[in-house]
C-alpha cells in the first residue's frame, strides 16, 4: 500500500523547493504561450488506484502541445498495431531537435520517432478516419479518455499555432514526397496543430500518466482506454525521445518514461504505480519546463522510483 502522507509530503516538498526557481523562458514563437504568466507552477500525482495528490496551481489549464503526441501514438497503436507503427514511423531517437528537417533528409524521409514533429505528423495520418473532422474528433476523444473529459480545443491556442506553423507544413510536404504520410499533407498538419492546441491541467496530465501506468485503464473512470499490450511501446518511446534533447539525461538521472511540451507541462510514468505531472511555463533551451523537470524528478527521487533500479 502507498502511504498517502508520504505521497502528499513528496509533492509538497517538490513544489516548495522548486516552484520559484529562476531560469528558462516561455516559448516565444507561439504568441499564446509567450503570454502565459511565468510564475505559475504545479505538481501532482495520480495513483493507479485513483488517489490524487497535488500542490500549486493544479487547476490552471495550459496547452498540451507535444505531450499530445503520446495520445496520438496510443491511438495509432490501437488502430494499426505496433508493427505498422514501427515500419511506417520508426522507433529510434533522431539525436536532433524536435522540429528538425535534417533528420528527415538523413534517413530518406522516414521520421524515425512518433515523438518528434515529423513522426507525430505522420502518426496523425495513420489514424483510421474518412475525413479531417473524423480524424480530429478521434484524437480529441482519446485525449479525453486518457486524461479527462474536460480536455478541449482552445480556439485561441489553435489560431496562434495555425498562423505560425510554416515549418511544420514544410515537414508535412517532405513526408508526403517521401511516401511517409498516409493522408493529405495539409490535413495531417492541420489536425496535428489542433491536437497540440488542447488545454489540460496538471491533475489531468497526471491522470494521463496514471492511465499508462495502470496498463491502459483510467484509474478515475475505471474504463479501459488502451490494450495493455500496447502500453510498453508508448513507454519505450517516451524513455527514448520524450524530453527532446534532454531525453538521455532524463533517463540517466530520473529513470522514468517522460514527455514534455512547450506549453510547460511534463509527465512521468511509474509503471504499475502512478503518473507524476508538473507544469510551469519557463523552458530550457531544449523546450522542457525548467521547474517541471525539477519537481517531477524530486517526487520520483523522494519516493525511490526509477525503472532501472531493482
Predicted regions and their residues:
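Active-site SXXK
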Residues: 49-50, 63-86, 208, 276
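A short, well-structured edge-of-sheet supersecondary motif
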Residues: 19-55, 265-268
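Active-site-adjacent helix/loop patches that line small-molecule binding or acyl-intermediate pockets
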Residues: 2-23, 76-195
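A charged amphipathic helix-loop-strand protein-protein interaction module that recurs
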Residues: 12-15, 19, 67-78, 228-248
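Structured C-terminal helix/loop/strand segments within mature extracytoplasmic catalytic/sensor domains
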Residues: 215-310
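A short acidic/small-residue loop/turn micro-motif
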Residues: 59-61
Amino acid at each position: 500500500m502507498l502511504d498517502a502522507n508520504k505521497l502528499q509530503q513528496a509533492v509538497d516538498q517538490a513544489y516548495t523547493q522548486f516552484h520559484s526557481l529562476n531560469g528558462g523562458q516561455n516559448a516565444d514563437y507561439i504568441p499564446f504561450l509567450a503570454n502565459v504568466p511565468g510564475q505559475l507552477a504545479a505538481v501532482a500525482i495520480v495513483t493507479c488506484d485513483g488517489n490524487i495528490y497535488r500542490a500549486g496551481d493544479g487547476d490552471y489549464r495550459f496547452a498540451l502541445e507535444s505531450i499530445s503526441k503520446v495520445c496520438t501514438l496510443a491511438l495509432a497503436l490501437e488502430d494499426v498495431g505496433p508493427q505498422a507503427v514501427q515500419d511506417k514511423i520508426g522507433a529510434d531517437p533522431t539525436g536532433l531537435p524536435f522540429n528538425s528537417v535534417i533528420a528527415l533528409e538523413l534517413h530518406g524521409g522516414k521520421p524515425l520517432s512518433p515523438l518528434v514533429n515529423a513522426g507525430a505528423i505522420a502518426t496523425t495520418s495513420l489514424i483510421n478516419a474518412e475525413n479531417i473532422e473524423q480524424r480530429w474528433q478521434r484524437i480529441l476523444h482519446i485525449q479525453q479518455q486518457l486524461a479527462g473529459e474536460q480536455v478541449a480545443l482552445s480556439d485561441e491556442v489553435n489560431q496562434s499555432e495555425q498562423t505560425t506553423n510554416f515549418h511544420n507544413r514544410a515537414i508535412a510536404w517532405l513526408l508526403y514526397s517521401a511516401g511517409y504520410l498516409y493522408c493529405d499533407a495539409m490535413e495531417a498538419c492541420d489536425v496535428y496543430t489542433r491536437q497540440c492546441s488542447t488545454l489540460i491541467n496538471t491533475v489531468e496530465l497526471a491522470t494521463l500518466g496514471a492511465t499508462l501506468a495502470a496498463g491502459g485503464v483510467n484509474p478515475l473512470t475505471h474504463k479501459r482506454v488502451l490494450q495493455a499490450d500496447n502500453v510498453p511501446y508508448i513507454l519505450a518511446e517516451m524513455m527514448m525521445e520524450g524530453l527532446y534533447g534532454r531525453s538521455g539525461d532524463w533517463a540517466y538521472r530520473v529513470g522514468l518514461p517522460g514527455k514534455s511540451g512547450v506549453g510547460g507541462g511534463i509527465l512521468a510514468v511509474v509503471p504499475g504505480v502512478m503518473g507524476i505531472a508538473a507544469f510551469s511555463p519557463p523552458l530550457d533551451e531544449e523546450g522542457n519546463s525548467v521547474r517541471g523537470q525539477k519537481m517531477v524528478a524530486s517526487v520520483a527521487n523522494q519516493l525511490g522510483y526509477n525503472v532501472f533500479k531493482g
